[in-house]
């Protein structure tokens, strides 16, 4: 019996191989650059610290949490019927996921802009130390994304194996993917799925970069060292995603996003990197979902 060719497996393999080659070439170019150019590229302190003190920062975070909780509570009371003891648990659907994302992201964005609008003395400091257009930011983000993506893959593989050891030892229970990832793999109404993908690629990177890098990282930078601020903000970023399987890889992603923000001096580069990462992850989910050879 002749072996059958699995087209999605071939496409996925070519994509991975292409990214590995591109990453290798970019790292070689980076290493071979003249020292003065490398030193100029790695100069830090491009991002203005957010020195507002713990009290004002605490007020801001409390406002964000309160707004999210209030909006989600109101939305739940309007769109969801309270479950009875005999009813089945609420199943996450694409439409429900869209509302969940919107009612999480929009309140955070609203608090951020309201604070800057009504209390500019504390909350309206500049996010960027370097001016970049969207196209220039994208040109900076693409090579950085290609350079660091294999590092994220390696971290994911190592962490998955560590979790397998923990699971075999009985230290952790069944390891599940993020609910949104499972939902995207399962599929649904095309319009709802497209909206969900758009939120993941467009809205989530913008809001999360503003909050986690533009606010949390810049504040931590004013209180501690750059490396500590990058690590702590990366940990907070990962914890907020509430998934054990992606916990350590997302810490690395959060650290990389903070370092990219710091070294380029413009939040748009981090937003583009984040958008590329989410888009690539969704693309690979789509490809693997069509494969009979790749485990889902």
Spans of model-derived segments:
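Transmembrane helix-loop-helix hairpins at the membrane interface
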Residues: 2-6, 13-27, 147-159, 171-296
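Membrane interface segments of multi-pass transport proteins and intramembrane proteases
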Residues: 80-89, 129-132, 166-172, 219-227
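Internal hydrophobic scaffold segments of catalytic domains
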Residues: 132-165
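Helix-to-loop transition at the C-terminal end of transmembrane segments
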Residues: 30-35, 79-80, 155-169
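N-terminal, membrane-interfacial amphipathic/helix-forming hydrophobic leader that caps
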Residues: 1-140, 282-296
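Short helix-terminus and kink motifs of transmembrane alpha helices
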Residues: 68-77, 121, 156-160, 164, ...
């Amino acid at each position: 019996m002749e072996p059958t060719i699995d087209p999605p497996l071939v496409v996925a393999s070519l994509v991975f191989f292409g990214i590995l080659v591109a990453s290798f070439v970019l790292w070689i170019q980076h290493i071979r650059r003249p020292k003065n150019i490398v030193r100029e590229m790695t100069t830090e302190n491009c991002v203005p610290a957010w020195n507002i003190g713990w009290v004002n920062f605490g007020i801001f975070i409390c406002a964000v949490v309160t707004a999210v909780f209030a909006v989600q509570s109101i939305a739940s009371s309007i769109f969801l019927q309270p479950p009875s003891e005999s009813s089945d648990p609420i199943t996450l659907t694409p439409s429900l996921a869209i509302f969940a994302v919107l009612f999480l992201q929009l309140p955070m964005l609203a608090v951020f802009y309201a604070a800057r609008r009504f209390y500019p003395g504390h909350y309206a400091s500049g996010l960027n130390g370097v001016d970049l257009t969207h196209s220039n930011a994208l040109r900076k983000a693409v090579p950085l994304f290609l350079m660091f993506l294999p590092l994220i893959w390696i971290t994911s593989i190592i962490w998955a194996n560590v979790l397998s050891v923990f699971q075999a030892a009985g230290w952790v229970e069944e390891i599940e993917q993020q609910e949104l990832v499972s939902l995207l793999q399962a599929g649904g109404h095309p319009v709802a799925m497209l909206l969900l993908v758009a939120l993941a690629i467009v809205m989530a990177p913008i809001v999360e970069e503003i909050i986690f890098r533009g606010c949390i990282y810049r504040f931590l930078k004013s209180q501690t060292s750059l490396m500590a601020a990058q690590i702590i903000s990366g940990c907070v970023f990962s914890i907020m995603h509430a998934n054990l399987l992606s916990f350590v890889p997302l810490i690395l992603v959060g650290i990389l996003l903070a370092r990219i923000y710091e070294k380029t001096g413009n939040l748009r580069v981090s937003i583009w990197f984040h958008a590329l990462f989410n888009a690539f992850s969704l693309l690979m989910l789509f490809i693997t979902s069509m494969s009979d050879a790749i485990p889902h």
